[in-house]
Amino acid sequence: MLGLLRRLFDNNEREIARYYKQVVEPVNRLEAEVEKLPDLAAAYRELKEKHEKGASLDELLPMAFALTRESAKRYLGMRHFDVQLIGGAVLHEGKIAEMKTGEGKTLVATLAVALNALTGKGVHVVTVNDYLARRDAEWMGPVYRGLGLSVGVIQHASTPAERRKAYLADVTYVTNSELGFDYLRDNMAISPDQLVLRHDHPLHYAIIDEVDSILIDEARTPLIISGPAEKATDLYYKMAEIAKKLERGLPAEPGVRKEPTGDYTVEEKNRSVHLTLQGIAKAEKLLGIEGLFSPENMELAHMLIQAIRAKELYHRDRDYIVQDGQVIIVDEFTGRLMPGRRYGEGLHQAIEAKEGVRIERENQTLATITYQNFFRLYEKRAGMTGTAKTEEKEFQEIYGMDVVVVPTNRPVVRKDFPDVVYRTEKGKFYAVVEEIAEKYERGQPVLVGTISIEKSERLSQMLKEPRLYLPRLEMRLELFKKASQKQQGPEWERLRKLLERPAQLKDEDLAPFEGLIPPKGNLRTAWEGLKRAVHTLAVLRQGIPHQVLNAKHHAREAEIVAQAGRSKTVTIATNMAGRGTDIKLGGNPEYLAAALLEKEGFDRYEWKVELFIKKMVAGKEEEARALAQELGIREELLERIREIREECKQDEERVRALGGLFIIGTERHESRRIDNQLRGRAGRQGDPGGSRFYVSFDDDLMRLFASDRVIAMLDRMGFDDSEPIEHPMVTRSIERAQKRVEDRNFAIRKQLLQFDDVLSRQREVIYAQRRLILLGKDEEVKEAAIGMVEETVASLAENFLNPEVHPEDWDLEGLKATLLDTAPQLQDFPFAELRALKAEEAVERLVEAALKAYEAREAELSPPLMRAVERFVILNVVDNAWKEHLHNLDVLRQGIFLRGYGQKDPFQEYKIEATRLFNEMVAFIKSEVAKFLFRLKVEAEPVRPVREAPYVPVPEAKPEPSEVFGVERKRATPPPQPGLSRAERRRLMRQEKKRKK
């Protein structure tokens, strides 16, 4: 194991050494030359011309990086460090750069962005929320504009026109969800002017900020565009009432109980519930039905299961909050609210019924994709985060991305203390309060991380109400009494009398008795515990001002986080992932100055305002004063910013002397990575700092995944909440529990991807062919329509004209009725004459007749109108069929695991069934399009000529089948044979296709 770790670190060191030689040294050599350039944009244009003439991006990297560094120096007052140049190179190579908090990931991205923008295909910088997208675009905008590049930013409220313009920019800042939904909406567009992504190379290169959050934490979350589906909502209320009447029991357990007890059992690890026989009978009685799981009642059974899951597994203020009569999901990884996102399969409706709010109608999926498959569509992708190495295996296996740990500019000096473990959650929270009180009294800033809104508010309540701490004092007092019961004498009697009123004890009351207590042993331990409890209560009574940052109180988020490093500051926050504001010791003077100027009417994101603030904070007052005159900033504002700078500087020195920012984790997360993100908020850029996690065996991680043997051992040893548990077995148990959960979650994500890959291949085919219809030339659209007509007529005819059956026995009446249902224009076709032909010839005769009827239809409508009709019909039929196909795949997936009981591999079964459903859908599309094109009545005003849509080359879809809508790619078409009619050539192609099948 040590050898493996050593090899991993050696590999990383070798990579870093390579970057120093190939990137850092050449860029540094160019610095003096680039500093003298009067026009950086002109120099950048020269690089672009070189690239167009064949120079590779790797060859142009040193100069592109040097120009970007100089642009940042000129327009932001920031110079890329050498390690930041390495980070830029890592991103350019399509890898993940692990960079610690405060190392300037936002600035690093500009290097890879500027280099890859030379292609002219557009670069997407993907962030986790609108605030960061806007902030980073406006903050880094001057760097790009200094090179002559345009910058776009997309927000949730952006209009289609604004989105189109932003995506056409050289650099686009956008959130992962907006980008994914724009992709899905583009693939539902019915005219080219509805598209917002670029027509050519829509997904060229993406740099994903907080890449672990998006590609791992969010991997199981599908992006879904949906429309309303009809389903009665009052049933959900009824199911919520029935769920209340059913009682939770215990599962069957070997050697303990043969059968499960109660009406249902709960499996928290998998978030599933199982009705017992007793529960099924009770539910049937309450519903007034028989056979809850019979086919006709399956919908009721599903709704009841979801109602029980809502009752037992989804908790208010942890998994969701209720706000303005709506159930809003809380992101379990970031603690942020996710308005607009809903649980699927009726679970959200079940929660709404449980909470008694109005139930929104269930939706039907119109388009869907997971982040895993969406980001794999990019020609090149890269990522940045503070924590990725622990998940490197997953990044490599699923995304083909290596992780490179970029060295910090200054060494990390933060101290990470061992975990403190308590038997119960109550004991753990008392200990956390004691630690907060101690740090607050010293003046050291504290950031407390919790995993839910409920826990953050509980801790806040304990700090506000000293009476909630009294049980801890009483417990400490009992322990001291027990330890001192054999002690005798007048002094001891005085002490015992004093201790009769514990709530009124003060530090000075206990001081005179210090000499009674021996320096070591149980009595000393109990005495120190009592003194600490008395002192903590006194600090709580004086008050511990604190800020709570969670999904309920997020409006002042950036301000709270920016000032969390000031002395005597206590901040309680749910998970800190994705909170993009640096915590600077002594407070963030830049943020305070920006807030001050904003109040005075200045745009804090305007690049000259930002540059002015940076110059003032850095003490470069002459340069700042010149900018102030240009911007119209008054002298008194300069003085106030100077005061802010000095206050923060003095406070920074005070906080450094106290040990920097201290991080307290109130619970270990399922993933070590999330714990590391919290730790990483302290010790930025070589600052001092510390961290410690408090854990209890009541925490979800330990309760669900820790070893039963360890818990049984603790029970036998009689551990209570008076002191933390310190044992190597406990520490190992925590590590093993986290590893177990990480492995399990990776397996789930891998399985999700396996199943989603089946859908992904089908989606790529449908979307690529759909895009061809939307953006292709008129002749390609006509070719597709004619192909569908031919395929449909031939397929219908072959069902009746069997070559192995004598022509006299062919059911020509049935054939006629079937074909006329599709193409009424064949009414006058001489069906009886077919008996004189061979089956193949008869089929071709019918196809030829259908094509003539189609040409007549086109002449009747006019070619431009016919093309418009073809586009409209094909796109609408495809969209409706795809929507139904997605529903069918959902139903298939929900029940596929039952096939495991029949000794069949569920995935293989899913693959086979999904392929069958896809082929049926394709056949249905062709049939419906043919029927619509023959039967559609066009009633319109005199038609104006329809302009041909601009032709844009569409990349080939990778997966099979390569042809769906009847458009034969030129490379797949057999060479024309002299003397053959078009129909004969088509027949040969159909025979070739059949042979391949």
UniProtKB/Swiss-Prot annotation:
Monomer and homodimer. Part of the essential Sec protein translocation apparatus which comprises SecA, SecYEG and auxiliary proteins SecDF. Other proteins may also be involved. ATP binds at Q84, G102, E103, G104, K105, T106, D582. Its main location: membrane. One of its GO terms (biological process) is protein targeting. This is Protein translocase subunit SecA. HAMAP family: SecA (MF_01382). It comes from Thermus thermophilus (strain ATCC BAA-163 / DSM 7039 / HB27). Coiled coil: none annotated. InterPro entries: Helicase_ATP-bd (IPR014001), P-loop_NTPase (IPR027417), SecA (IPR000185), SecA_CS (IPR020937), SecA_DEAD (IPR011115), SecA_motor_DEAD (IPR014018), SecA_preprotein_X-link_dom (IPR011130), SecA_SF2_C (IPR044722). Its EC number is 7.4.2.8. Residues 957-971 have a biased composition (Basic and acidic residues). It is found in: Cell inner membrane; Cytoplasm. Transmembrane segments: none annotated. It is an enzyme of class 7 (translocase). GO terms for molecular function: ATP binding; protein-exporting ATPase activity. It catalyses: ATP + H2O + cellular proteinSide 1 = ADP + phosphate + cellular proteinSide 2. Residues 984-997 have a biased composition (Basic residues). Keywords: ATP-binding, Cell inner membrane, Cell membrane, Cytoplasm, Membrane, Nucleotide-binding, Protein transport, Translocase, Translocation, Transport. Residues 950-997 are annotated as: Disordered. Belongs to the SecA family. GO terms for cellular component: cell envelope Sec protein transport complex; cytosol; plasma membrane. Part of the Sec protein translocase complex. Interacts with the SecYEG preprotein conducting channel. Has a central role in coupling the hydrolysis of ATP to the transfer of proteins into and across the cell membrane, serving as an ATP-driven molecular motor driving the stepwise translocation of polypeptide chains across the membrane.
